[in-house]
Amino acid sequence: MIPSAGRHRMGAAGRAAHGVLALLALGANAASLFIGATESSTIPEGAGWTRLWAAGWQNLVNQPLFFTFMSNFLVGITALLLALRPSGRGAVFGAVRLSGLVCLVITGVVFNVLLRDDTLLPLFTAVLDAVQHVITPILAPLLWLLFGPRGQVTGRRVLASALIPVAWLVVTLVRGALVDWYPYVILDVPTLGYAGIAVYVGAILGLYFVLAGLFWWVDNRLVRRVRVAAAA
């Protein structure tokens, strides 16, 4: 019998690896909340917004508005679910996991190419930065490639998965206009205007669909390979 995509089973090594990924991603987010609770926010040099968040609950509840936090949260939660029970996941899980994977890869690319500067960070913050912007963006797609589960990426799920970052963008821009704060300089509406940020948004959204399409293509190729091997 040729195994279907839904019968793909993740072994102990895959479950353990996803447990480590969940620990890293969710642990890093917990550390971000701690920093928000103990430190005030800062404004990047040249930014057009003026809002500062004081240390404590204000800056703590602001942390989930960062794309990095959201990406690591999506990957961390889906990795935890795979570590606990890797089989029987449906369409919603597949779309959410794909969204997390693609968003986290984008996090690594955009932050390290466009947003990273030469500021010397304290050790704790530097470790957190490395985990959220380098380690998890590499580890998450690597574990997907090694352990699957396969057959969960479809055209409909690619489209559905994009609703999450689009919703994040809408909330970020509406909230930014209300409270005069934006998480990144590439979304600095007061300085760049909506036309200016549209260049970045369009490029990143295009990158999202390119990466999601790549995940889809690779997934289909691997499913075919498994079926051919099983039929031989």
Predicted regions and their residues:
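Non-cytosolic membrane-interface motifs at loop->transmembrane helix junctions
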Residues: 93-95, 119-132, 156-157, 187-191, ...
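Interfacial helix-start motif at the membrane-water boundary
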Residues: 54-73
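Membrane-interface transmembrane-helix boundary segments in multi-pass integral membrane proteins
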Residues: 9-14, 65, 179-215
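Perimembrane loop-to-helix junctions flanking transmembrane segments
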Residues: 41-60
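Interfacial segments of alpha-helical transmembrane regions
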Residues: 88-103, 154-162
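Alpha-helical transmembrane segments of multi-pass membrane proteins
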Residues: 23-46
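Membrane-interface loop-to-helix entry segments
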Residues: 67-70, 125-138, 202
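N-terminal membrane topogenic signal
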Residues: 3-21
